Every structure is written in structure tokens, then in C-alpha cells.
């Protein structure tokens, strides 16, 4: 995006693996922005942190939440809170359909493991079925959309900021991104039926 569209008050982030995407795709007013990020594997804190940031800065200053799909699975019920209390937060989800940070760290820390050698990472692939996070948000009263190409991203961000700044409503953008690193091409999951 070219230049800052609005002065963002805070960008809580709960996506360890997407820091490059965050700084590349959300380059608004860095000097005025407060960044908060998790540490120590605290997946799921992002939605609550964004709601707290919005309460702190008030209606006049925008808050953008950036998180990965894995982190969102721990806290998606927060969309209901955003809708109920008109908490105008723009939520941008980097959706790679995996717990990428867990897979990447496992491959780095235990490179000779059976998981790395077979490409089978139990419980880390989040597709089959895929979650439509924009639809999940809508089911709780928050409008949103899914972005599949880089060309679609800037217009989606503009719509999201319009919704949050002018209409004072929350908005979700589910951005499909590629998996990266060791095991990125693995779509294996243990299939069993009752």
C-alpha cells in the first residue's frame, strides 16, 4: 500500500510466523502505531488484546489485529464480543491452514524426528475441512471477506478500515497465504472415523 491511509492506534499481533507479512502488508503510520505481540507460545491472546486496546484508545483511533489462523482457533468467540459491544476492530488473518510455527520449530529442534522424515505432523494441518473465517465471523455478527490474491488485499483493507473508522463496526479479512518451511507441502492428518 502506498502511504498511511489512517493513523492506526495499535496493532496487536498473535502470529509468530507472519511478522514479515505484517510489516509488508500493513504498512500504515508506523511512527504513531503501538505494536504488541505474544511471546512464549501464547496462542490465542490476540483477540482479547485487540478488544482491550480498543477500549483503551476509544472510538476515534483505529485498532488493527493481525493473527494467524492457528492463533484464531483459540479465540474466535471474541468476534461475538466485538459485535455485541460495537468494538470496531479490523482483524486481518494470515490463513495458511496450519499451525506453522509448531511445525517449523519441531523441524528445527528435532530435525531427525520421524515427523520430519515422513512429513507427517499430527494435528498441525488445519484443512480438510477448511475453516471459512469470514463466515465464522459473520455467524457471530461481524462482517468480513476472504482474500485469495495480493491484488485483492489493498481494496479489502480499505473496505475494512472504512467499516471500522466510519461505520464504527468490526470487520474481518481472511487472507489466504502460502505455507512455508519444512513440511509446508504436507497435507497429512490422521484420518479415523467413529
Regions found by a protein language model. Give the residues of each.
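Thiamine diphosphate
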Residues: 21, 25-194
Amino acid at each position: 500500500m502506498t502511504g498511511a491511509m489512517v493513523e492506526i492506534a495499535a496493532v496487536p499481533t498473535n502470529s509468530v510466523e507472519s511478522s514479515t507479512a505484517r510489516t509488508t502488508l500493513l504498512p500504515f503510520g508506523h511512527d504513531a502505531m503501538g505494536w504488541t505481540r505474544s511471546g512464549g507460545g501464547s496462542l490465542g491472546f490476540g483477540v482479547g488484546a485487540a478488544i482491550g486496546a480498543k477500549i483503551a484508545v476509544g472510538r476515534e483511533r483505529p485498532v488493527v489485529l493481525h493473527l494467524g489462523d492457528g492463533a484464531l482457533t483459540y479465540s474466535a468467540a471474541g468476534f461475538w464480543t466485538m459485535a455485541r459491544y460495537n468494538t470496531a476492530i479490523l482483524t486481518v488473518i494470515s490463513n495458511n491452514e496450519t499451525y506453522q510455527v509448531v511445525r517449523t520449530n519441531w523441524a528445527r529442534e528435532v530435525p531427525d524426528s520421524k515427523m520430519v522424515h515422513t512429513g507427517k505432523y499430527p494435528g498441525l494441518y488445519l484443512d480438510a475441512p477448511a475453516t471459512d473465517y469470514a463466515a465464522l465471523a459473520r455467524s457471530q455478527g461481524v462482517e468480513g471477506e476472504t482474500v485469495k490474491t495480493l491484488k485483492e488485499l489493498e481494496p479489502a483493507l480499505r473496505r475494512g478500515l472504512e467499516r471500522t473508522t466510519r461505520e464504527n463496526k468490526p470487520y474481518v479479512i481472511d487472507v489466504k497465504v502460502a505455507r512455508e518451511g519444512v513440511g509446508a507441502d504436507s497435507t497429512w492428518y490422521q484420518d479415523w472415523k467413529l
